[in-house]
Design a protein with these regions (language model features):
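Conserved SAM-binding loop
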Residues: 1-127, 228-232
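S-adenosyl-L-methionine-dependent methyltransferase catalytic module, highlighting the catalytic core
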Residues: 95-104, 108-110, 114-231
Length: 233
């Protein structure tokens, strides 16, 4: 019931922002906030970050969301953000853009600031069992990620790459976090099925798709997401 109410409120907020009398927050509004925390994608009132963060999305405006494409540079100064979180968003963005995006997040984070990243884990049995594969056994489409597979390409907003810990490590190793930061790989599955499942400090940013909150892996706790905490030095 509460979730349904939140959806109605979010929808009303969008209409009132688009047609008046409310307005979308600006980057100047963000910089004037006491708490400068960003959340990639649409920020809904049903999640705890609605009280602490502003979302970044070009698709859905509201009083809690900045109208901006996260792959474009952020029009704010260096070292002006306390924390940046992305949960199940970056797999919808072309893999070739990841390192530059990580570096832009590093630029705007204040020293000691946190980049919390969570992505679907494609070594996880829960995620693998639903995927379509190509002739060499490679994952080509995840129907749960949205979009369509057309002529070998995922279109219309689906997962355009399929995160595994080996890929994510390489991305961070190529980013500024490797040379000017600390990277903690908190939860992930290895190719051989072994995994790391360290406790998550949810006070730093709630994550839904973990054994603590996701019923699919609650009976036999194991990673369903790759969770990384990267701190700027």
């Amino acid at each position: 019931m509460k979730e349904q109410i939140y959806r109605y409120v979010d929808a009303a907020d969008y209409i009132l922002c688009r047609y008046g009398p409310l307005s979308f927050p600006s980057w100047e509004d963000f910089l004037a906030r006491n708490s400068r925390k960003l959340y990639a994608g649409k920020l809904r009132r049903a999640i705890p970050q609605a009280a602490t963060h502003l979302g970044i999305t070009p698709f859905f405006g509201s009083t809690r969301n900045l109208h901006h494409d996260v792959t474009e540079p952020f029009p704010i100064p260096d070292c002006s953000v306390e924390a940046f979180q992305s949960e199940d968003v970056f797999e919808h963005i072309d893999l070739s853009k990841m390192v530059s995006l990580f570096n832009e997040i590093h630029r705007v984070l204040a020293p000691g600031g946190l980049f919390r990243l969570s992505l679907p884990d494609y070594h996880s049995d829960q995620n693998l069992q639903r995927c379509q594969r190509g002739p060499r056994g490679e994952i080509v489409f995840d129907p749960a990620g949205g979009g369509k597979l057309v002529d070998g390409r995922v279109i219309e907003g689906g997962h355009v790459w399929f995160p595994k810990i080996e890929i994510v490590r390489d991305l961070f190793n190529e980013s500024l976090f490797a040379t000017h930061g600390t990277i903690k790989y908190v939860q992930y599955t290895n190719a051989d099925g072994t995994f790391k499942l360290d406790p998550i400090d949810y006070s730093l940013g709630y994550i839904q798709r973990t054994p603590d909150h996701d019923a699919r892996v609650a009976d036999r706790p194991r990673p369903i997401s790759i969770v990384v905490d990267a701190f700027k030095s």
